[in-house]
């Protein structure tokens, strides 16, 4: 471990974060989707944080919804991006 990592702590790697999110989704799928999708608020907050790094977006313009169509659950993410040049 480097001196800087010891002083400032190590930042979680993107791959590790993605792995944790995927594990959460797989666990939800294996449980049969019973109950409400408890992870949606956390997922929406993570999306807002990541998108805000690259685009100035209103948090209210990011919607995350989980729908069931036949035997398939569909995770829908709608993001209203600001218009440029106006």
Curated annotation (Swiss-Prot):
Q: Which SUPFAM superfamilies match?
A: Cell division protein MinE topological specificity domain (SSF55229)
Keyword Cell division assigned to the entry: answer is yes
Q: Mind listing the UniProt keywords for this protein, alphabetically?
A: Cell cycle, Cell division
Source domain of life: Bacteria
Pfam families per the record? MinE (PF03776)
Q: Which GO terms describe its biological process?
A: cell division; regulation of division septum assembly
InterPro entries linked = MinE (IPR005527), MinE_sf (IPR036707)
Q: What does this protein do?
A: Prevents the cell division inhibition by proteins MinC and MinD at internal division sites while permitting inhibition at polar sites. This ensures cell division at the proper site by restricting the formation of a division septum at the midpoint of the long axis of the cell.
The record's similarity note reads: Belongs to the MinE family.
Protein name in the entry: Cell division topological specificity factor
């Amino acid at each position: 471990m480097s001196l800087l990592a010891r002083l400032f702590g190590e930042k979680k790697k993107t791959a590790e974060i993605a792995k944790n999110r995927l594990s959460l989704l797989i666990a939800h799928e294996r449980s049969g989707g019973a109950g409400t999708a408890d992870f949606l608020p956390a997922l929406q907050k993570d999306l807002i944080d990541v998108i805000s790094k690259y685009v100035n977006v209103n948090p209210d313009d990011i919607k995350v919804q989980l729908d069931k169509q036949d035997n398939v659950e569909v995770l829908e993410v709608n993001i209203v991006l600001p218009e440029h040049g106006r």
